[in-house]
């Protein structure tokens, strides 16, 4: 559990008016699950603290060689729970949060993947993730006056999903069991189970 005391007076639903706040990780995750903008001072301060913590540990992970057992230990520190013994990850690995990544059994993540997981990233059993894949669970407002606001939404991969190198999975996307994302795709919408998608934006190429 993370308890980060902010320096700002209350101006959101998580605390009482006029009081200083201590936001917990559970507070943040519950708020992010609503999809509301992450734009209050309390939330921004909490995100900064969590980003600093995640980057400190990922620096240790990426700075030198580690055995897979050591990699899993550091990832467990980043994610806040003991990751499965069947997880294999080739560093470098990047995240600016880390506490909302959920990984099943027999998952493989290749080098240089980026997890922006504030909205939640779930990888089902047997997923294979290629080089340089980006999971982006935050989006910005379209209107210029709202563009500084970020809005969270989860990304969910079912079982046995294969994501090719240099793909980007955007917020709110669910990819069904056994599907394949071709290299370089930008996935903006849900992917049905047992399909291959590719392109920018990604579209169904064939059924498996």
Tell where the protein language model's regions lie, with residue ranges.
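Extended beta-solenoid/beta-helix repeat architectures
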Residues: 173-176, 191
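Short arginine-rich
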Residues: 137, 189-194
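Flexible, glycine/small-residue-enriched loop-and-beta-strand segment within the central core
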Residues: 93-103, 108-174, 200-208
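Short alpha-helix at the nucleotide-sugar/activated-sugar donor binding site of glycosyltransferases
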Residues: 128, 179-180
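Conserved active-site beta-strand element of glycosyltransferases/polysaccharide synthases
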Residues: 197
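Terminal amphipathic alpha-helical/low-complexity segments used for targeting or macromolecular assembly
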Residues: 1-86, 202-205
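A generic "structured core" feature
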Residues: 162, 180-182, 186, 194
């Amino acid at each position: 559990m993370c308890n980060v005391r902010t320096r700002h007076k209350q101006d959101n639903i998580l605390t009482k008016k006029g009081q200083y706040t201590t936001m917990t990780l559970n507070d943040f995750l519950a708020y992010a699950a609503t999809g509301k903008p992450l734009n209050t001072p309390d939330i921004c301060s909490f995100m900064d603290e969590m980003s600093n913590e995640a980057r400190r540990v990922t620096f240790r992970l990426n700075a030198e060689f580690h055995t897979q057992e050591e990699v899993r230990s550091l990832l467990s520190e980043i994610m806040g729970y003991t990751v499965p013994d069947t997880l294999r990850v080739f560093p470098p690995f990047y995240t600016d949060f880390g506490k909302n990544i959920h990984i099943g059994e027999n998952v493989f993540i290749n080098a240089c993947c980026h997890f922006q997981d504030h909205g939640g990233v779930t990888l089902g059993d047997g997923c294979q993730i290629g080089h340089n894949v980006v999971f982006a669970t935050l989006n910005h407002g379209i209107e210029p006056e709202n563009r500084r606001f970020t809005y969270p939404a989860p990304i969910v991969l079912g079982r046995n999903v294969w994501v090719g190198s240099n793909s980007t999975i955007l917020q709110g996307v669910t990819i069904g069991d056994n599907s394949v994302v071709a290299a370089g795709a930008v996935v903006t919408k849900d992917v049905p189970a047992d399909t291959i998608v590719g392109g920018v934006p990604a579209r169904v190429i064939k059924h498996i």
